Every structure is written in structure tokens, then in C-alpha cells.
Regions:
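Multi-pass membrane proteins that catalyze or facilitate reactions on polyprenyl-/lipid-phosphate substrates
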Residues: 1-278
Length: 278
């Protein structure tokens, strides 16, 4: 029998889709909802399920940015064949994404027992939500927002890509929140910071989902819940991406800062009152 029902999978897929690319921590929200539904957040199958449904959200990014991805991969392919093409920004950007993914892969493999153990606690999630809000507020205030997407460099990609480790070690910090905050501190404008966060998330999140797939299928999560959760995640994430890009073009990140604090405080309250367990 599956530890997650189809109905629960649909709810979790919607939560994943809404929050994966918003700087509010999809992992944190998934753990909160899992706790409220009585699903053991540290169960190996549940952790695997959460990673797999991320693939639906990543598929939404691939579809939404299909033309950009084809352009970048085409430039990369031309550069591999022709040295003259290697000065093209898209060719270099493709390599930057690859290099920037290496740190999170190494840390993820080395620290997997810790990540799926003590650091999976909802107390850690609550604290990370609040701490991350402070970092995001400071980054949005201190960043000069003067550099566009064409101004990104190898240094930018490596620093932003490496910042994903914060969310890996401290669920609740938010991968998107960490990457967007780092990009803002590097003076990228909000739209450029958001798009860079999307592109850097593609290999890391896809790899995590595929890596966990065999475990999720083998230890208590059925194919039907996985399919339902992933499909819902895709549909909702696509809408979330479109909304976020329009939002950051005209607004600051203050709304997300306030929301994170409220959710973090609420989670501390629920844990303290014993409504949900850590």
C-alpha cells in the first residue's frame, strides 16, 4: 500500500507547483502540508516522492523557456564544433550552468544522510524560513538592480549556483530565495535574478528527482500518486512561473519577505502547540 494516496499527491503536487520557483521554500511548504495531513515528513519514501514531483515543476520550466533553452543548447553545440562560436555568450552560459551545478551535487551526495535526517526537522524549516527572509530583504535593499541578463558572468553563475547549497542543508531557506538573493547582491535586476535562478535550477532539481525515483517507487509510493503529483506540479508550476516574472518586473520582494516570516512564526506555533510533529 502506498504511503501517499492519490488525493494527497494532488494536494502536494499543487503545493510544489506553486512554491518551487517562488522564493518561499517548496520543501518547507511540502513538509508543513505533509505534517498537517499526518504524513511522516522524514519517511524515506515521502522524501523521495517530494524530489520526484519536482520533475513536474522542472518540466514546466523547460516548456516555458523552451526557445531560450534551444537557443543556448544550439550555441553550445556550435561552440563544441567551431572555436569561433565559443565567444558567444550563450555558449559560455551553457558551461556556466554545468559548472555551477557541481557544488550542490557534491554536497548533496556527501551530506544525504544528514539532509534526510536531522536537517529535515520542521524546527529547522521554521528557522530557515525566517532567517532566509532577512537575507532576502537585505539583498533586495542593498542590490543596485543595474545589471541585466546579458551582463551575467561566470562568477555570477558560480556564486548563485553555489548558494543552492543553503537550501539543501536548511530546508525552508528556499533554493529560489537563496539564488535570487545572491543574484540581487551581485547587482542583477530582479527579472535577471529570477531568470538566472530558473536556469540554474534545471539540472540540480532534475538530477535530484531522477536520483530519488528508484527509491520512491521501491519503498512505498505507487506509480499513480507519483504520476498525479507530478502532473499537477507541472500545470501549477507553469502558471506560477508566468505570474512571478510579471510580478518581479514591477514589485520588490517585500511581499515574500513578510509571507515567509508569517509562515515561519506560524510553524513555530504549530510545533510548540503540538498540532504537528517535527
Amino acid at each position: 500500500m502506498s504511503v501517499i494516496s492519490v488525493g494527497q499527491a494532488i494536494v502536494l503536487g499543487a503545493v510544489e507547483g506553486v512554491t518551487e520557483f517562488l522564493p518561499v521554500s517548496s520543501t518547507g511548504h511540502l513538509k508543513i502540508v505533509e505534517g498537517l495531513m499526518g504524513i511522516p515528513v522524514d519517511d524515506h519514501a515521502v522524501v523521495g516522492f517530494s524530489a520526484v514531483i519536482q520533475v513536474g515543476a522542472i518540466a514546466a520550466v523547460l516548456v516555458y523557456f523552451f526557445k531560450d533553452i534551444v537557443r543556448i543548447l544550439s550555441a553550445w553545440g556550435r561552440g563544441l564544433r567551431d572555436r569561433e562560436e565559443r565567444y558567444h555568450h550563450d555558449y559560455k552560459f551553457a558551461w556556466w550552468v554545468i559548472y555551477a551545478t557541481i557544488p550542490i551535487v557534491l554536497v548533496g551526495l556527501a551530506a544525504k544522510p544528514l539532509i534526510q535526517g536531522p536537517l529535515a526537522s520542521l524546527w529547522v524549516v521554521a528557522g530557515s524560513l525566517i532567517a532566509g527572509s532577512g537575507v532576502m530583504w537585505a539583498a533586495d535593499q542593498l542590490g543596485r538592480h543595474k545589471r541585466g541578463e546579458d551582463d551575467t558572468s561566470f562568477k555570477d553563475a558560480m556564486l548563485v549556483g553555489s548558494s543552492q547549497i543553503l537550501a539543501l542543508l536548511f530546508p525552508g531557506f528556499s533554493r529560489s530565495g537563496a539564488t535570487m538573493s545572491t543574484a540581487l547582491l551581485l547587482d542583477l535586476d530582479r527579472v535577471a535574478a529570477t531568470r538566472l535562478s530558473f536556469f540554474l535550477g534545471i539540472p540540480a532539481l532534475t538530477g535530484a528527482g531522477l536520483y530519488e525515483l528508484k527509491d520512491a517507487l521501491g519503498v512505498g509510493v505507487g506509480a499513480a500518486p507519483l504520476a498525479a503529483g507530478t502532473l499537477v506540479s507541472f500545470v501549477v508550476a507553469y502558471a506560477s512561473i508566468a505570474w512571478l516574472l510579471k510580478f518581479v518586473a514591477k514589485h520588490s520582494f517585500n511581499a515574500f519577505v513578510i509571507y515567509r516570516i508569517v509562515v515561519g512564526v506560524l510553524l513555530f506555533g504549530l510545533l510548540g502547540a503540538g498540532v504537528i510533529s517535527s
